[in-house]
Amino acid sequence: MKKILAVIAASVYLMSPSANAQTITGAGATFPYPVYSKWSEAYQVKTDIQLNYQSIGSSGGIKQIKAATVDFGATDAPLKGEELTASGLVQFPTVLGGVVPIINIEGIKPGELQLTGDVLAKIFVGHIVVWNDKRIQELNPKLKLPDANITIVHRADGSGTTFIFTDYLSEVSTVWKEEVGKGAAVKWPATSSVAGKGNEGVAANVARVKNSIGYVEYAYAKKNKMTYAKLQNRDGKYVDPDDLTFAAAAAGADWFSTPGMGISLVNQKGAQSWPITGATFILMYREPKNAKNSQETIKFFDWAFVNGGKLAADLDYVPLPKAVTDRIRSDVWTQIKK
């Protein structure tokens, strides 16, 4: 719990700027906060450029960039082409990661509980309400699951992590698609539920509430040593979340088929694919108010694309393919006025 609270406390200022450091500002998704933090620390050592990133959720990041109060917004729920055009924004991905179900069931270790997408959806929609429900028990015949009510933990804020998670549930469950649907914020149907702000808040609540289940970006689960569930993927294989299964899900992605590269990576084919994989995105103005800071923002992410791969991989994020970063340099950043 102390580690989770430490992440929350650190979520506004990534490092303390030196007296002469230039500061670039961003706000939005909590999904990439751990890797942006590591990139910022390393980049400031090299350049003395300070990144002030507010980890406030994707919806907040979109609002902040549209209000022109930050140099960039960050979202895991990509904007569509028409919204980008209408807002005068460009969009590009920075890194890939996975969303994982996390649980707090006494005696259950990470990866021991196995769930299908359909059963996961039925839990979150409120059709399965106890852990020893036969539909869960049949998937886990060797586990002794408690006769205890399930508490759902979800995001309180508009969230790209929620967008990725509900996008997946909509892909694998007709019931979820018809009753709830996908979005950065949805009306959660389960009656026994607790809301948390940010990935940090969801992780903290799952750690606190016995017999609960929630969803977070994998780096939060790993950092806080939380128990995750294995998921059955589209090929019928049960897989663990890690950088290899996230990369497998993105292997066949057609990045250039959608404006702003806003593709969905959930429920992809492949025996090794993690089914709840997603990219996180940056939003910037084509004609920024502060051109100098916009160019420094570009330099920061360019440095990260070249030098930040190991830092990302250490946190089980997946760096973008070179073809994607090359296209970002040639087709996206060139649209931003200097």
Regions found by a protein language model. Name each.
Residues 2, 11-12, 48:
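Generic N-terminal initiation segments characterized by hydrophobic and/or small/turn-forming residues
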Residues 12-20:
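C-terminal segment of classical bacterial N-terminal signal peptides
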